[in-house]
Amino acid sequence: MALARRTPKVGLALGSGSARGWAHIGVLQALLQEGVRPDVICGSSIGALVGAAYAAGELERFADWVGGLGLRDVLGFMDFKLSGGMLKGEKLIAFWRRNFADFDIESSPLPFGAVATDLHSGAEVWLRQGSIADAVRASIALPGLFTPVRRDDGRLLVDGGIVNPVPISLARAMGADIVIAVDLNSDILHRHMQPLVQPPGREVQAHEPAPDAPALQAEEAAAGQGGWMERVRAWMPGTDAAGAAPPRAPSMLDVMLTSVNIMQMRITRSRMAGDPPEMVVAPQLAQMELLDFHRAPEAIAEGRRATLAALPQLRRYMD
């Protein structure tokens, strides 16, 4: 009697990449459209955030919310702290718990894992148990931006992209036979760190102020917040202190985040050489700044495009 052929298990490894990570939403939408449903899902940093939304069955509602984010909304999630990182991240995770996912990973409808980094030992940490919201918060704790997360066992965790930007190894450990890897940093060296002097007549559309910027500034002034918001804008990529024009040189935060992403690109190349995935999706989003979380629609569209272009790689293993 012939043995039944086992259906290969598909794993999705969603990579780190800050705001470009909204492309993961488009990747998932395109896969589902083509009838490819991941059996396991894992992520590093922003990949853990989007992966958790999918594992919780909340992808489309999450996509609707992300697509409506404006600059005002992004600024509203910034809860500043003087030590350990610029932001505490409590506002974001509290919102996530209320609106999307607040359950233990073990009870997830779909097997889910997140990657974090032990700040003391440098070890890679796979988060497969406990609160899914806490796992996401640890995985997105980019050093310098978000404060580290202290776990119950005493470990201090930071962003998973520091050690494993595209967690192919975790997807395989979770039982995946076929791994689809989403690499958001493949074109990082083509990013446009703004030149010191713009060519004559050249305008950088990506840095235009939000239409509601004057109203937002008025609200800040009325609330006595103008001073610290001026400093925030000086830190943020793509704006000067008034938020009105591109800078003559990269901001401190832009330099820090771009340096981290270059490091992650090198790590990804090395790890993929040793453990190549069956399919690589590489959205081309070099034009997006790392904190452009208000530009989700174009990232989602590029995620869809890149996935559909890469699908022939997958068909060889699925047929």
Label every model-predicted segment.
Residues 1-44, 52-319:
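Patatin-like phospholipase
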